[in-house]
């Protein structure tokens, strides 16, 4: 999508867009392609970095849980995915696709964000990854991760002293 379309054609925006654009050819100028797929790892990284930067979120610690509140405007429950990776990384992602165009309609301005939404959060050690719940209401996703109960303090072990 072009910055001109949004009225953001400035030298700064052009420079930023140029830095974020990834060519479709080899991954590097020397043709160093470690992925074997034309630099797709680089494109994936840039796409994911853009998605993470554009997805606002709040993290709250509650008495018995952690709450992750993520804006996911225009996404339905079928478009949102919540996963726990590597046993300690909470991944919230989704994708908003362009609506079907009407033949007789012409966009004069498109400001709503299309594309991928994603955030990754490293969970604290006391988070119970088996007790994760997610609710989406009015474009706001709330993921709740319960805390593990605090470990009980160890009681001192009494050793019987025998008289010899």
UniProtKB/Swiss-Prot annotation:
The keyword Secreted does not apply. Gene3D superfamilies: 2.60.40.790. It holds the Pfam family HSP20. It is found in: Cytoplasm. GO terms for cellular component: cytoplasm. GO terms for biological process: protein complex oligomerization; protein folding; response to heat; response to hydrogen peroxide; response to salt stress. Keywords: Cytoplasm, Stress response. Residues 48-164 form the sHSP domain. GO terms for molecular function: unfolded protein binding. Its main location: cytoplasm. The keyword Cytoplasm applies. Belongs to the small heat shock protein (HSP20) family. This is 17.8 kDa class II heat shock protein.
């Amino acid at each position: 999508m072009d910055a001109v379309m949004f009225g953001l054609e400035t030298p700064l925006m052009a420079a930023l867009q140029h830095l974020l654009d990834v060519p479709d050819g080899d991954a590097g100028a020397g043709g160093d392609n470690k992925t074997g797929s034309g630099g797709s790892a680089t494109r994936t990284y840039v796409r994911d970095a853009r998605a993470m930067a554009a997805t606002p979120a709040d993290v709250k610690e509650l008495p018995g849980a952690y709450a992750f509140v993520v804006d996911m405007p225009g996404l339905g429950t079928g478009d949102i995915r919540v996963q726990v990776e590597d046993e300690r990384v909470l991944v919230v992602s989704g994708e908003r696709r362009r609506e079907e165009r009407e033949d007789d309609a012409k966009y004069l301005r498109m400001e709503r964000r299309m594309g991928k939404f994603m955030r990754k959060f490293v969970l604290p050690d006391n988070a119970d990854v088996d007790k994760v719940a997610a609710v989406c209401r009015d474009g706001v996703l709330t993921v709740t991760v319960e805390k593990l109960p605090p470990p009980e303090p160890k009681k001192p072990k009494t050793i019987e002293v025998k008289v010899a």
